[in-house]
Amino acid sequence: MKDLLCDISAFRYWRLPPQVRALCPPLPRPEEDWQRYGLVRNPTAAVVLGFPLYTLVRTRNKRTCPASIRQRLFLGELPRESVLETEHGFLITSPLLTAFIMSRHLTDLQLLLVLAEMCGLFAVCALPAALEAELTRAIDSGAISTTFGWVRCPSEDGAASNLWRRDALVLGRDLDRFCSDICGMRYGNRFMAVSQLVPLGAASPFEVEAYLLLGLPRALGGEGFCGIELNVEVTLSTSARAIVGKSRVYIDLLLSSPDGRRQVAIECQGKASHGRAGDGLRDADRMTALQAMGYDVLLLTHRQISDEGRFRAIVKAVCRMLDAEYRDKSSDEQRAETL
Protein backbone atom coordinates (compact mmCIF):
# COMPACT_ATOMS: atom_id res chain seq x y z
CA MET A 1 0.00 0.00 0.00
CA LYS A 2 1.35 3.41 -0.95
CA ASP A 3 1.78 6.35 1.40
CA LEU A 4 -0.82 9.10 0.99
CA LEU A 5 0.98 12.41 1.41
CA CYS A 6 -0.96 15.37 2.78
CA ASP A 7 -0.57 18.66 4.64
CA ILE A 8 2.72 20.54 4.17
CA SER A 9 4.34 17.59 2.35
CA ALA A 10 1.62 17.66 -0.30
CA PHE A 11 1.80 21.45 -0.48
CA ARG A 12 5.53 21.28 -1.19
CA TYR A 13 4.86 18.69 -3.89
CA TRP A 14 2.25 20.87 -5.60
CA ARG A 15 4.74 23.72 -5.61
CA LEU A 16 7.35 21.62 -7.43
CA PRO A 17 7.75 22.38 -11.14
CA PRO A 18 7.45 19.28 -13.37
CA GLN A 19 11.06 19.84 -14.44
CA VAL A 20 12.10 19.21 -10.85
CA ARG A 21 9.72 16.29 -10.32
CA ALA A 22 11.32 14.59 -13.32
CA LEU A 23 14.60 14.46 -11.39
CA CYS A 24 13.08 12.89 -8.28
CA PRO A 25 13.34 9.12 -7.65
CA PRO A 26 10.21 7.36 -6.34
CA LEU A 27 9.68 6.74 -2.65
CA PRO A 28 10.06 3.14 -1.43
CA ARG A 29 6.78 1.35 -0.82
CA PRO A 30 5.97 0.88 2.89
CA GLU A 31 5.63 -2.92 2.61
CA GLU A 32 9.13 -3.12 1.11
CA ASP A 33 10.63 -0.67 3.61
CA TRP A 34 8.69 -1.38 6.77
CA GLN A 35 11.33 0.14 9.07
CA ARG A 36 11.53 3.16 6.73
CA TYR A 37 15.32 3.14 6.50
CA GLY A 38 15.08 3.50 2.72
CA LEU A 39 12.70 6.42 3.09
CA VAL A 40 15.15 8.28 5.31
CA ARG A 41 17.87 7.93 2.66
CA ASN A 42 15.60 8.77 -0.27
CA PRO A 43 16.51 12.19 -1.78
CA THR A 44 12.93 12.95 -2.80
CA ALA A 45 11.84 12.65 0.82
CA ALA A 46 14.96 14.02 2.49
CA VAL A 47 15.86 16.90 0.15
CA VAL A 48 12.78 17.82 -1.86
CA LEU A 49 9.81 17.20 0.44
CA GLY A 50 11.59 17.36 3.79
CA PHE A 51 11.06 15.48 7.02
CA PRO A 52 8.82 14.71 8.69
CA LEU A 53 6.57 13.56 5.87
CA TYR A 54 2.88 14.06 6.56
CA THR A 55 0.60 11.19 5.55
CA LEU A 56 -3.16 10.77 5.73
CA VAL A 57 -4.79 7.82 7.49
CA ARG A 58 -8.50 7.01 7.54
CA THR A 59 -8.84 4.99 10.76
CA ARG A 60 -7.38 5.38 14.23
CA ASN A 61 -5.93 1.86 14.32
CA LYS A 62 -3.68 2.65 11.34
CA ARG A 63 -1.89 5.43 13.16
CA THR A 64 1.78 4.75 13.83
CA CYS A 65 4.58 7.06 14.87
CA PRO A 66 7.84 6.49 12.95
CA ALA A 67 10.28 9.35 13.44
CA SER A 68 10.26 10.28 9.75
CA ILE A 69 6.46 10.43 9.42
CA ARG A 70 3.65 12.34 11.05
CA GLN A 71 0.09 11.31 10.38
CA ARG A 72 -3.12 13.23 9.96
CA LEU A 73 -6.38 11.46 10.74
CA PHE A 74 -9.33 12.08 8.42
CA LEU A 75 -12.56 10.41 9.47
CA GLY A 76 -15.58 10.26 7.21
CA GLU A 77 -15.98 10.45 3.45
CA LEU A 78 -13.32 12.23 1.43
CA PRO A 79 -14.35 14.96 -1.02
CA ARG A 80 -14.63 13.94 -4.67
CA GLU A 81 -11.42 13.41 -6.66
CA SER A 82 -9.33 14.37 -3.65
CA VAL A 83 -6.72 11.57 -3.80
CA LEU A 84 -4.43 11.46 -6.82
CA GLU A 85 -1.72 9.12 -8.10
CA THR A 86 1.83 10.33 -8.68
CA GLU A 87 4.73 8.88 -10.65
CA HIS A 88 6.87 8.81 -7.52
CA GLY A 89 5.53 5.82 -5.63
CA PHE A 90 3.00 7.59 -3.43
CA LEU A 91 -0.50 9.02 -3.48
CA ILE A 92 -1.15 12.71 -2.90
CA THR A 93 -4.07 14.74 -1.63
CA SER A 94 -5.51 17.13 -4.20
CA PRO A 95 -4.53 20.78 -3.89
CA LEU A 96 -7.82 21.67 -2.21
CA LEU A 97 -7.81 18.75 0.23
CA THR A 98 -4.20 19.66 0.98
CA ALA A 99 -5.27 23.21 1.88
CA PHE A 100 -8.25 21.94 3.87
CA ILE A 101 -6.05 19.68 6.01
CA MET A 102 -3.50 22.47 6.44
CA SER A 103 -6.26 24.83 7.57
CA ARG A 104 -6.27 23.10 10.97
CA HIS A 105 -3.01 24.83 11.86
CA LEU A 106 -3.13 27.96 9.64
CA THR A 107 -4.52 31.39 10.40
CA ASP A 108 -7.23 32.73 8.12
CA LEU A 109 -4.68 34.91 6.32
CA GLN A 110 -2.24 32.04 5.85
CA LEU A 111 -5.02 29.86 4.45
CA LEU A 112 -6.09 32.68 2.15
CA LEU A 113 -2.54 33.01 0.79
CA VAL A 114 -2.27 29.25 0.22
CA LEU A 115 -5.54 29.20 -1.71
CA ALA A 116 -4.58 32.32 -3.66
CA GLU A 117 -1.43 30.59 -4.90
CA MET A 118 -3.34 27.42 -5.84
CA CYS A 119 -5.96 29.48 -7.68
CA GLY A 120 -3.30 31.73 -9.18
CA LEU A 121 -1.04 31.53 -12.21
CA PHE A 122 2.17 31.21 -10.20
CA ALA A 123 4.05 29.06 -7.72
CA VAL A 124 6.78 29.99 -5.28
CA CYS A 125 9.45 27.29 -5.19
CA ALA A 126 12.90 27.83 -3.72
CA LEU A 127 15.13 24.91 -4.69
CA PRO A 128 17.95 23.60 -2.49
CA ALA A 129 21.36 24.41 -3.95
CA ALA A 130 22.13 20.78 -4.83
CA LEU A 131 18.80 20.36 -6.62
CA GLU A 132 19.25 23.69 -8.39
CA ALA A 133 22.61 22.54 -9.72
CA GLU A 134 21.18 19.19 -10.82
CA LEU A 135 18.32 20.91 -12.63
CA THR A 136 20.76 23.18 -14.46
CA ARG A 137 22.91 20.23 -15.54
CA ALA A 138 19.89 18.24 -16.71
CA ILE A 139 18.54 21.13 -18.79
CA ASP A 140 21.94 22.04 -20.25
CA SER A 141 22.60 18.42 -21.25
CA GLY A 142 19.15 18.00 -22.76
CA ALA A 143 18.31 15.20 -20.33
CA ILE A 144 14.98 16.84 -19.52
CA SER A 145 12.79 19.19 -21.49
CA THR A 146 12.05 22.73 -20.44
CA THR A 147 8.57 22.61 -21.99
CA PHE A 148 6.61 21.20 -19.07
CA GLY A 149 4.10 24.04 -18.90
CA TRP A 150 5.90 25.81 -16.05
CA VAL A 151 8.22 28.71 -16.85
CA ARG A 152 10.65 30.25 -14.43
CA CYS A 153 10.37 34.02 -14.13
CA PRO A 154 13.53 36.12 -14.12
CA SER A 155 14.34 38.50 -11.30
CA GLU A 156 15.10 42.16 -11.92
CA ASP A 157 18.79 41.39 -12.51
CA GLY A 158 17.93 38.64 -15.00
CA ALA A 159 18.86 35.74 -12.70
CA ALA A 160 16.47 32.86 -12.05
CA SER A 161 13.98 33.64 -9.31
CA ASN A 162 11.83 31.48 -7.03
CA LEU A 163 8.72 32.52 -8.96
CA TRP A 164 7.31 30.14 -11.59
CA ARG A 165 4.51 30.74 -14.06
CA ARG A 166 1.98 27.96 -14.56
CA ASP A 167 -1.73 27.42 -15.16
CA ALA A 168 -3.95 27.54 -12.10
CA LEU A 169 -4.06 24.32 -10.07
CA VAL A 170 -7.59 25.17 -8.95
CA LEU A 171 -10.36 26.89 -10.92
CA GLY A 172 -13.25 28.79 -9.41
CA ARG A 173 -15.70 25.98 -10.15
CA ASP A 174 -13.35 23.47 -8.48
CA LEU A 175 -13.32 25.59 -5.34
CA ASP A 176 -17.11 25.89 -5.34
CA ARG A 177 -17.56 22.13 -5.73
CA PHE A 178 -15.06 21.35 -2.99
CA CYS A 179 -16.81 23.73 -0.61
CA SER A 180 -20.09 21.93 -1.25
CA ASP A 181 -18.39 18.61 -0.44
CA ILE A 182 -16.98 19.77 2.90
CA CYS A 183 -20.12 21.56 4.04
CA GLY A 184 -20.92 20.24 7.51
CA MET A 185 -17.43 18.89 8.14
CA ARG A 186 -15.28 20.12 11.00
CA TYR A 187 -13.38 23.23 9.84
CA GLY A 188 -15.65 23.31 6.78
CA ASN A 189 -17.47 26.56 7.59
CA ARG A 190 -14.21 28.40 8.21
CA PHE A 191 -12.70 27.09 4.98
CA MET A 192 -15.77 28.14 3.01
CA ALA A 193 -15.73 31.62 4.55
CA VAL A 194 -12.08 32.13 3.62
CA SER A 195 -12.66 30.76 0.11
CA GLN A 196 -15.09 33.62 -0.58
CA LEU A 197 -12.17 36.05 -0.29
CA VAL A 198 -9.74 34.23 -2.61
CA PRO A 199 -8.53 36.14 -5.69
CA LEU A 200 -8.66 33.98 -8.82
CA GLY A 201 -5.96 34.19 -11.47
CA ALA A 202 -3.33 36.32 -9.75
CA ALA A 203 0.00 36.21 -11.59
CA SER A 204 2.36 36.85 -8.67
CA PRO A 205 2.49 37.05 -4.86
CA PHE A 206 2.63 40.83 -5.15
CA GLU A 207 -0.62 40.87 -7.11
CA VAL A 208 -2.21 38.82 -4.34
CA GLU A 209 -0.92 41.22 -1.70
CA ALA A 210 -2.14 44.27 -3.63
CA TYR A 211 -5.53 42.65 -4.24
CA LEU A 212 -6.00 41.85 -0.56
CA LEU A 213 -4.93 45.30 0.60
CA LEU A 214 -7.35 46.96 -1.79
CA GLY A 215 -10.16 44.44 -2.01
CA LEU A 216 -10.65 42.92 1.44
CA PRO A 217 -13.49 44.44 3.46
CA ARG A 218 -12.37 47.17 5.80
CA ALA A 219 -13.41 45.06 8.77
CA LEU A 220 -10.73 42.57 7.66
CA GLY A 221 -7.99 45.13 7.09
CA GLY A 222 -8.48 46.00 3.42
CA GLU A 223 -9.77 49.12 1.70
CA GLY A 224 -13.09 47.65 0.61
CA PHE A 225 -12.89 48.26 -3.15
CA CYS A 226 -15.44 45.92 -4.73
CA GLY A 227 -15.28 43.92 -7.94
CA ILE A 228 -11.52 44.04 -8.53
CA GLU A 229 -10.56 42.06 -11.64
CA LEU A 230 -7.16 40.41 -12.08
CA ASN A 231 -5.13 40.08 -15.28
CA VAL A 232 -7.69 41.63 -17.56
CA GLU A 233 -6.87 41.27 -21.25
CA VAL A 234 -7.22 44.49 -23.23
CA THR A 235 -7.37 44.40 -27.02
CA LEU A 236 -5.70 47.58 -28.18
CA SER A 237 -6.96 50.04 -30.73
CA THR A 238 -4.88 50.79 -33.80
CA SER A 239 -3.37 53.91 -32.26
CA ALA A 240 -2.59 52.20 -28.94
CA ARG A 241 -1.13 49.22 -30.79
CA ALA A 242 1.30 51.51 -32.54
CA ILE A 243 2.70 52.59 -29.17
CA VAL A 244 3.64 49.12 -27.94
CA GLY A 245 3.78 47.05 -31.11
CA LYS A 246 1.38 44.49 -29.63
CA SER A 247 -2.29 43.79 -30.20
CA ARG A 248 -3.09 43.25 -26.52
CA VAL A 249 -1.81 43.93 -23.03
CA TYR A 250 -2.86 42.77 -19.57
CA ILE A 251 -3.97 44.89 -16.65
CA ASP A 252 -2.78 43.49 -13.34
CA LEU A 253 -5.66 44.88 -11.27
CA LEU A 254 -8.67 46.66 -12.71
CA LEU A 255 -10.88 48.69 -10.38
CA SER A 256 -14.22 50.06 -11.53
CA SER A 257 -16.58 52.65 -10.11
CA PRO A 258 -19.97 51.35 -8.88
CA ASP A 259 -21.68 52.65 -12.03
CA GLY A 260 -18.96 51.18 -14.27
CA ARG A 261 -18.21 54.49 -15.95
CA ARG A 262 -14.71 54.99 -14.55
CA GLN A 263 -11.90 52.47 -14.35
CA VAL A 264 -8.41 52.49 -12.85
CA ALA A 265 -5.71 50.11 -14.07
CA ILE A 266 -3.05 49.23 -11.50
CA GLU A 267 0.26 47.79 -12.67
CA CYS A 268 2.11 45.86 -9.96
CA GLN A 269 5.85 46.45 -10.15
CA GLY A 270 7.14 43.30 -8.44
CA LYS A 271 10.69 42.10 -7.92
CA ALA A 272 10.22 39.31 -10.46
CA SER A 273 8.63 39.40 -13.86
CA HIS A 274 5.08 38.11 -14.11
CA GLY A 275 6.11 36.08 -17.13
CA ARG A 276 2.80 36.58 -18.95
CA ALA A 277 2.14 37.30 -22.57
CA GLY A 278 3.04 40.93 -23.03
CA ASP A 279 6.20 40.79 -20.91
CA GLY A 280 9.11 42.67 -22.39
CA LEU A 281 7.00 45.71 -23.08
CA ARG A 282 8.40 48.76 -21.42
CA ASP A 283 6.18 49.91 -18.58
CA ALA A 284 6.02 53.43 -19.98
CA ASP A 285 4.77 52.12 -23.33
CA ARG A 286 2.16 49.89 -21.72
CA MET A 287 1.01 52.71 -19.47
CA THR A 288 0.74 55.11 -22.40
CA ALA A 289 -1.16 52.57 -24.51
CA LEU A 290 -3.68 51.97 -21.72
CA GLN A 291 -4.11 55.69 -21.24
CA ALA A 292 -4.75 55.98 -24.97
CA MET A 293 -7.55 53.44 -24.43
CA GLY A 294 -9.10 55.69 -21.80
CA TYR A 295 -7.80 54.04 -18.63
CA ASP A 296 -6.39 55.89 -15.66
CA VAL A 297 -3.19 54.01 -14.77
CA LEU A 298 -1.24 53.75 -11.51
CA LEU A 299 2.06 51.97 -10.95
CA LEU A 300 2.26 50.20 -7.58
CA THR A 301 5.50 49.08 -5.90
CA HIS A 302 6.43 47.07 -2.81
CA ARG A 303 7.86 50.21 -1.28
CA GLN A 304 4.59 52.06 -1.69
CA ILE A 305 2.43 49.44 -0.02
CA SER A 306 4.97 49.00 2.78
CA ASP A 307 4.79 52.67 3.73
CA GLU A 308 1.50 53.55 5.41
CA GLY A 309 1.54 57.18 4.32
CA ARG A 310 2.34 56.41 0.68
CA PHE A 311 -0.24 53.66 0.47
CA ARG A 312 -2.91 55.89 1.99
CA ALA A 313 -2.11 58.53 -0.63
CA ILE A 314 -2.51 55.93 -3.39
CA VAL A 315 -5.86 54.81 -2.01
CA LYS A 316 -7.07 58.39 -1.97
CA ALA A 317 -5.84 58.86 -5.55
CA VAL A 318 -7.79 55.77 -6.65
CA CYS A 319 -10.91 57.14 -4.97
CA ARG A 320 -10.53 60.42 -6.86
CA MET A 321 -10.07 58.59 -10.16
CA LEU A 322 -13.19 56.51 -9.49
CA ASP A 323 -15.10 59.59 -8.34
CA ALA A 324 -15.63 57.88 -4.97
CA GLU A 325 -15.52 59.46 -1.53
CA TYR A 326 -12.66 58.41 0.73
CA ARG A 327 -13.56 57.77 4.37
CA ASP A 328 -10.98 57.60 7.13
CA LYS A 329 -10.85 54.22 8.84
CA SER A 330 -12.35 53.74 12.27
CA SER A 331 -10.19 52.56 15.16
CA ASP A 332 -11.53 49.01 14.75
CA GLU A 333 -10.74 49.06 11.02
CA GLN A 334 -7.23 50.34 11.71
CA ARG A 335 -6.75 47.58 14.26
CA ALA A 336 -7.80 45.00 11.65
CA GLU A 337 -4.88 46.09 9.42
CA THR A 338 -2.43 44.65 11.95
CA LEU A 339 -4.14 41.26 12.34
Each model region followed by its residue ranges:
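Surface segments flanking catalytic/ligand-binding clefts of nucleic-acid enzymes
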Residues: 154-339
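Short gly/ser-rich loop at a beta-strand->alpha-helix junction or flexible surface loop bordering the NTP-binding
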Residues: 1-187, 339
